[in-house]
Amino acid sequence: MLPKKYDPNEIEPKWQKYWLEEKIYKYRLDENKPSYAIDTPPPFTSGTLHLGHVLSHTWIDIIARYKRMRGYNVLFPQGFDNHGLPTELKVEKEFGITKDQPEEFLKKCVEWTWQAIEAMRKQFIRIGYSADWDLEYHTMDDWYKAAVQKSLLEFYKKGLIYREEHPVYWCPKCRTSLAKAEVGYVEEEGYLYYIKLPLADGSGYIPIATTRPELMPACVAVFVHPDDERYKHLVGKKVKLPIYEREVPILADEDVDPNFGTGAVYNCTYGDEQDIVWQKRYNLPVIIAINEDGTMNENAGPYAGLKVEEARKKIAEDLEKMGLLYKKEKIKHRVLRHTERSSCMAPIELLPKKQWFIRVKDFTDEIVKVAKEINWYPEDMFLRLKDWAESMDWDWVISRQRVFGTPFPFWVCKNGHIIPAREEDLPVDPRFDKPPVEKCPVCGAEIEPVTDVLDCWVDSSITPLIITRWHEAIKGDEEAKKWFEHNFPTALRPQGTDIIRTWAFYTIFRTFKLTGKKPWKDIVINGMVAGPDGRKMSKSYGNVVAPDEVIPKYGADALRLWTALAPPGEDHPFKWETVDYNFRFLQKVWNIYRFAERHIKDFDYEKYKDIELEPLDRWILSRLHRIIKFATEELERYRFNLITRELMTFIWHEVADDYIEMVKYRLYGDDEESKLKAKVALYELLYNVMLLLAPFVPHITEEIYHAMFKDKIGEKSVHLLSWPEYREDRIDEKAEKLGELARKVVSEMRKYKNSHGMPLNAKLEHVAIYALESYDDLKLIEKDIAGTMNIEKLEIFKGEPQLEERIVEVKPNYKRIGPRYGKLVPRIVEHLKNNAESIAREIKENGKVEFEIDGEKVELTKEDVMIKKEVFSEGERVETAVVDDIVILFF
């Protein structure tokens, strides 16, 4: 029996424990069942889930539960992305160990990561996440690192991996190179500096504009637009850089924007991506003025050792003293920052470094073509990937100057030759392991280990191969081969908008290059979570809400409904009032089933399910099956928000407020046949509503199932039952019309009772309904209206009622007449009382009435009085309500 009170903190942990103990979600390879493999996102092991995780992973869980109910064999593992700078920083801070002790440092990284995994797994379980935890994977596992290294060896064989010096995105704060996908432009306030550069021949100056005067020591050219009349005569000349007394050429290039600043810019190696393009296009020298730590180097001359920001300020001051800085304009401009890690956000420098690359730029057309074969939800998210692919300036930098990461499976010699690891030795760590050979097989030189580690996206970009056991299948493992063939390409990749250009892009590329196939059939994209104030959640805004703040108060199911209301591809604000509403909805659901339990728990539905039902039963079941059809179609499109709103509205209003209220008189009445039909409809309705809700709110539906249905059905979980079957024969448009009519009429009668302070079950002695077009339909539901509203005498007539409106009282507006007539007011009141009808008529006709009291003229307008009217039918006073063509008379 369902307890009186809905308490999610009581029921939710109980069922989470039950699901784990009974292995309800255990995946077993079954080649006779259709496969549905989900390439779940492995969150970085920060130690705690945020609401973004809750949103994305609840979506995934809804899909998994739905697909199981549709008969699919759902492969639903969950992994954790372990490597990365935040863990290294945490270990340095927590344990006081530096990277100079690599083995001890790595040991502590692994130790801390395991603690984070344990905490996050508990949080996943607490939101009702139905992964098969026996398939959990971690990117720091040896077998996982071996698979990543195997994929790199395959790329090396294909000629896709190389090492060279190239300008890379460099984070001075993190002291490592970054991929383009890890950086982004942030709009900020800054200054545009206008500087006069002297011409080398002494004939004058050329004015340039720059946001970075500190890069002057790295200037290698000045550029103008070839059609700019202001500077055409200067092309080919040289300028002499102030402070450094070095000459650089003035060149013309169409990439210059003549409308920016002065229309002339200097080319420094390297201020931005455009500087790289010009340096390569014109084979200009490379001068580096910035160190890895973000300080100026010896090429900066008198500014060496200063931080970039300090050097910018000092060189601007010196140029101003020299009379060469003639304007400093405050502007908003875009600054390149380390955006992937909100804990960093440092400005990025472009520094030439010896780095490892995967060739990807040559394959962007191929990647876009493969991506187009995937079904994108929403469709326009494909364009984000396409735009990203087409904007790439150089290949994927995969090396990171860190410690905790998957090692490269390579050694190098001093002549630059690459020595790959033997496959049978994987995983290897060149920092600690012996190389496969003593000398370089190409030139005989000494061999050195590659001490860099891999970009974490190299790890996570093979997740669809990891979960389908590609790494075992290619070794000849027969079971793994079957597993891979049955599950790859995977059915679904769920992920956020923020990692389309990283996880989605790199996974499509890497998987296709390794298998010749797309990684998934569908990809569904969720937006980001905003704070209650609509802004991005941030500690600096003070608008961060943690899942652990929400669940103890409202439970996981109420929070899950909040996630389900998020539109695909759009940002979704967290609103406390939404979760509160969801909780009240679940209380309503609880009360519906508590009411129904006594009527249908022991009812033999199978015996009576084909009985001819009454109009309102047919109405609610017709509406139910329309909802089933809609929910099924929209779940296939991953539009949870549309289903959730429709389902909540249907349950709260049509089921709880209307049908159940209109069926109570039958369930408690003496008409056994009518009671039987009501039970058939109520059972079919609530059994299927439970199934429709199950993927969204798994805990409350499991509680309901065990309390009301399990004894008859036998299956050990609601989540092992079949999805509701849409029945075309249940669609009844005539019954739906009758149901809507009953709702409207009953609603008006409820309003009448409320306005008179009557309980909803209070008796109405006499009600008459008049209608024209609706007359025949009203006669069909006459019994339901009378029974629902407890009407002693209900009459339904065809036609319009004969009504008489009478003036029964005219009252004065004391605030208006008091100041005007003072002592006469009591006499005026008496006059109004005795002549109410004639006074009201005259005011209606003339807008005013005039009369005398004790010889003094009194004039009243419609604003001075309140006219009370009453309606009579056949001499008896009535109150009326009108809905459509229907007039309701309350006697």
Curated annotation (Swiss-Prot):
Which GO biological process categories is it annotated with? valyl-tRNA aminoacylation
Reported EC number(s) for this entry are: 6.1.1.9
Which enzyme class? ligase
Which Gene3D superfamilies does its entry note? 3.30.720.200, HUPs, Isoleucyl-tRNA Synthetase, Domain 1, Valyl/Leucyl/Isoleucyl-tRNA synthetase, editing domain
Binding-site positions, ATP: 539
Q: Which UniProt keywords apply?
A: Aminoacyl-tRNA synthetase, ATP-binding, Cytoplasm, Ligase, Nucleotide-binding, Protein biosynthesis
Record carries keyword Aminoacyl-tRNA synthetase: yes
Where does the record say this protein resides?
A: Cytoplasm
Give a Pfam family name. Anticodon_1
Residue ranges spanning the membrane: these are none
Q: Which CDD domains match?
A: Anticodon_Ia_Val, ValRS_core
The domain comment in this protein's record states: ValRS has two distinct active sites: one for aminoacylation and one for editing. The misactivated threonine is translocated from the active site to the editing site.
Q: What does this protein do?
A: Catalyzes the attachment of valine to tRNA(Val). As ValRS can inadvertently accommodate and process structurally similar amino acids such as threonine, to avoid such errors, it has a 'posttransfer' editing activity that hydrolyzes mischarged Thr-tRNA(Val) in a tRNA-dependent manner.
Protein name listed in UniProt: Valine--tRNA ligase
Q: Which gene encodes it?
A: valS
